[in-house]
Amino acid sequence: MRKIIVGSRKSKLALTQTNWFIDQLKALGLPYEFEVKEIVTKGDVILDVTLSKVGGKGLFVKEIEHALLTKEIDMAVHSMKDMPAVLPEGLMIGCTPKRVDPRDAFISKNGASFKELAEGAILGTSSLRRSAQLLAARPDLQVKWIRGNIDTRLRKLKEEDYDAIILATAGLQRMGWDDEVITEHLDETLCVPAVGQGALAIECREDDKDLLQLLAHMNDAITERTVAAERVFLHKLEGGCQVPIAGYATLKENDTIELTALVGSMDGSVLLKETVVGTNPEEVGLEAAGRLIKQGAKELILAANKEQQ
């Protein structure tokens, strides 16, 4: 019986996601054992600055990918939104399980909705994507950076001077806390989700055919296609955590993919947004990127990167 070593970050959410996925594999009743190996990533260690200042995309995966390449582990369960657009040679996304709620969750200290927040209220987020879109809707708000895992951020909301914070609904759902803490879900039209938000990425080595066969049982074709369109868009624009960039695709009638893509300025004063429909994920992603580039997306990205330096 083969033992599969599964790499995971040490956070409660990462371990919850990893153990959930292992349980799904065990339920298949195939001859495999599983062992979790906890790995500390750069993103877990550097907590005093925003993600965009310390390298953005890849902060939570590089050390895990190194362990995959050196065969210390066989596979890893990531949040898809943490995955860079391009993976190291020899690694691949072995499967994408069914996506859960991709929306952002708004959590306020006193139960006020986003619209009801007092003028000048302090909003906690460490995401340029969230801050740009929410400042576009409410320029009066003050954005204050907040880092740490879910529990830490919820504690900071209670104890510090934040009036509200934004977290991914998916993480709260996986922890079983969504009903307890969420004030409201932000509609995708108000705050377009991050590329891959709500989805998991199961990463493994390309040459591990045995494991790839096992993972195929857990792949969700709709999630795979929609996330692929989002990631092509992200790759074409070379966007990461350093840029206010968003992309969310859904499957519509007749097997068509509808992708809403967005690039913004850091302060939310400019938001470029396009919706593209098509059947081929790559073509949809490239078309969305192309349309935004024509509107000046590359210039916004350059400006955002300069502001981060």
From Swiss-Prot:
The keyword ATP-binding belongs to this UniProt entry's keyword annotation: no
Cofactor(s) named in the record: dipyrromethane
GO molecular function, a single term: hydroxymethylbilane synthase activity
A GO CC term attached to the entry: cytoplasm
Key words of the record: Porphyrin biosynthesis, Transferase
Record-annotated disulphide pairs: none
Sequence intervals crossing the membrane: none
The protein's enzyme class: transferase
Cofactor note as given: Binds 1 dipyrromethane group covalently.
Modified residues (S-(dipyrrolylmethanemethyl)cysteine): 241
The enzyme's E.C. designation: 2.5.1.61
Pathway assigned in UniProt: Porphyrin-containing compound metabolism; protoporphyrin-IX biosynthesis; coproporphyrinogen-III from 5-aminolevulinate: step 2/4
Miscellaneous note of the record: The porphobilinogen subunits are added to the dipyrromethane group.
Subunit organization: Monomer.
Family stated for the protein in its record: Belongs to the HMBS family.
HAMAP family for this protein: Porphobil_deam
Protein name: Porphobilinogen deaminase
The organism of origin for this protein: Bacillus cereus (strain G9842)
